[in-house]
Amino acid sequence: MHTLKTLVLMVFLSVFFIFVGSLIGGKQGATFALIMALGMNFFAYFFSHKIVLAMYGAKEVSEAEAPELYNIVRRLAQKAELPMPKVYIIDSEQPNAFATGRSPKHGVVAVTTGIMRILSREELEGVIGHELAHIKHRDILISTIAATIAGAISYLAQMAMWANIFGGRHDDEEGGGHPIVALLMMIIAPLIAMIIQLAISRSREYAADEDGARIAGNPLYLSNALRKLHYASQAIPMDANPGTAHMFIVNPLSGKTLMKLFSTHPPIDERIARLEAMARRY
């Protein structure tokens, strides 16, 4: 079921991208968008996890190097009926974690040195359960493709804008639409793409919280961890790329600007409240 959902979303986002390309650039725009969509989906599927791990200097560790962390990941992966993911550690004081990998067979769990320092074993289990839920649901692949397509739509709109400014339009020859429609799509399409990306990311965070709590065995493990991580991430800066912020369990960016309205993460208070309500039903 999760594989089917992933495929459907990939197709939907790609078709939307091609549709935007056709409205902005006619047949040539649609063709260009199709080629870009195929290339980006291929690249995101096979290489995105390697890039993000290298971006943060993550180092793979063995059981001998991080026995407690490794034991937690292995035990919870078995409980979730997942293959053992690779375990990585990021040298960063900000307590945070993320999962990556295109499928459960290629799963990776990465945690910072900071998170291992401030969380108890139970809280760390809550975090690992959350990340394993992302792997089980193939959320990382979906989020990566959504972010890639959203960025590409913005790029396509910018290209079209500069082409109109410096090159004019030849709609009759190229099969493009009305110039006003194209102009509106240049403005609206990136916003629509961003909203789709945020909706996908936020809904999947809630689902990973709930399923991760079940994997860990107690929703309060994760709710307590989130409370600590939220305040620590605000106090301890991390040199994080905004394009990968959606991958982390809590937003690694400061979030003290208007961009907080467009956060890829649901409000931390709501996440904690949901988990505490879940704990009362246990």
From Swiss-Prot:
Protein name listed in UniProt: Protease HtpX homolog
GO molecular function: metalloendopeptidase activity; zinc ion binding
Family assignment from sequence similarity: Belongs to the peptidase M48B family.
One GO CC annotation: plasma membrane
Cofactor(s) essential for the protein: Zn(2+)
Catalytic EC class: hydrolase
Species whose genome carries this gene: Thermodesulfovibrio yellowstonii (strain ATCC 51303 / DSM 11347 / YP87)
Pfam families registered for this protein in UniProt: Peptidase_M48
InterPro entries: HtpX_protease, Pept_M48_protease_HtpX, Peptidase_M48
Sites where the protein binds Zn(2+): 130, 134, 205
